[in-house]
């Protein structure tokens, strides 16, 4: 995968030299290029200007971003504009991006963009319902979530298919050694070696966590008969606890 990032602050992306993303780059599975579009600004070096019609703040000008974009060697990239008004980023979208060969991220700053910049864009994406100073942190988050899904980056597919959201549910609780720590013990079912019982326990706990913390994820979830039965048990158990 090849990723190009248009930004005023390329130095902010140093974390992408480390961990999973850094390893993917060293393996040759990922190429990341940074393009400081201030270098594409006209002689004044100004990348922003006041909005026509008045208003607060400054807008990024179209010219530096268009010129930076034009200078990138590309075929048919997915061009992502980081914008609070865009579609909310989620795991399903990360899975979409992981199938692409070329991605371009445009990171904004200041009050917003000249609307004409959006002529370059295929996707307008938001990290969530809040405003960041710039698009760099959002871009890094999306890149990390996407790159780890590329085949061979993590190694074992199960490492990410069991993650929260990959199945549509939050991930079940997990434990490692020691068996007992400060009076807290590992659930016996996980010590049993009985794979089917462990699978059922994990599914039950995933459903329970999702029902309690993110019930919105269950609204469009396609339940199996087993999952429906487990959810009924969870609701009955919680009702008894509240009596």
Swiss-Prot record:
InterPro entries: Alpha/beta_knot_MTases (IPR029028), tRNA_m1G_MeTrfase_C_sf (IPR023148), tRNA_m1G_MeTrfase_TrmD (IPR002649), tRNA_m1G_MTases_N (IPR029026), tRNA_MeTrfase_TRMD/TRM10 (IPR016009). One of its GO terms (cellular component) is cytosol. Its main location: cytoplasm. Its EC number is 2.1.1.228. Gene3D superfamilies: 3.40.1280.10, tRNA(m1g37)methyltransferase, domain 2. GO terms for molecular function: tRNA (guanine(37)-N1)-methyltransferase activity. The gene is trmD. This is tRNA (guanine-N(1)-)-methyltransferase. It catalyses: guanosine(37) in tRNA + S-adenosyl-L-methionine = N(1)-methylguanosine(37) in tRNA + S-adenosyl-L-homocysteine + H(+). It is an enzyme of class 2 (transferase). It comes from the Bacteria. The keyword Transferase applies. The keyword Repressor does not apply. GO terms for biological process: tRNA N1-guanine methylation. It comes from Streptococcus gordonii (strain Challis / ATCC 35105 / BCRC 15272 / CH1 / DL1 / V288). Pfam families: tRNA_m1G_MT. Keywords: Cytoplasm, Methyltransferase, S-adenosyl-L-methionine, Transferase, tRNA processing. Specifically methylates guanosine-37 in various tRNAs. S-adenosyl-L-methionine binds at residues 108, 127-132. Belongs to the RNA methyltransferase TrmD family. It is found in: Cytoplasm. Homodimer.
């Amino acid at each position: 995968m090849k990723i190009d990032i248009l930004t005023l602050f390329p130095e902010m992306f140093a974390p992408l030299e480390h961990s999973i993303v850094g390893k993917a780059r060293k393996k040759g599975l990922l190429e990341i290029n940074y393009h400081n579009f201030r270098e594409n600004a006209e002689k004044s070096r100004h990348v922003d200007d006041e909005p026509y019609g008045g208003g607060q703040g400054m807008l990024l000008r179209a010219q530096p971003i268009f010129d930076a974009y034009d200078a990138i060697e590309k075929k048919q990239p997915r061009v992502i504009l980081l914008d609070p008004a865009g579609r909310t980023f989620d795991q399903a979208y990360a899975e979409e991006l992981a199938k692409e060969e070329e991605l371009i991220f445009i990171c904004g700053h200041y009050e917003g963009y000249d609307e004409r910049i959006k002529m370059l864009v295929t996707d307008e994406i938001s990290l969530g319902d809040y405003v960041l100073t710039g698009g760099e942190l959002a871009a890094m988050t999306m890149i990390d979530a996407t790159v780890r899904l590329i085949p061979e980056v993590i190694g074992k597919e199960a490492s990410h298919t069991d993650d929260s959201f990959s199945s549509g549910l939050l991930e079940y609780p997990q434990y490692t050694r020691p068996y007992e720590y400060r009076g807290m013990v590992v659930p016996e079912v996980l010590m049993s070696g009985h794979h089917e019982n462990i699978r059922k326990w994990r599914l039950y706990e995933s459903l329970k966590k999702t029902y309690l913390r993110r019930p919105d994820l269950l609204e469009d979830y396609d339940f199996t008969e087993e999952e429906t039965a487990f959810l009924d048990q969870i609701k009955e158990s919680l009702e008894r606890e509240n009596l």
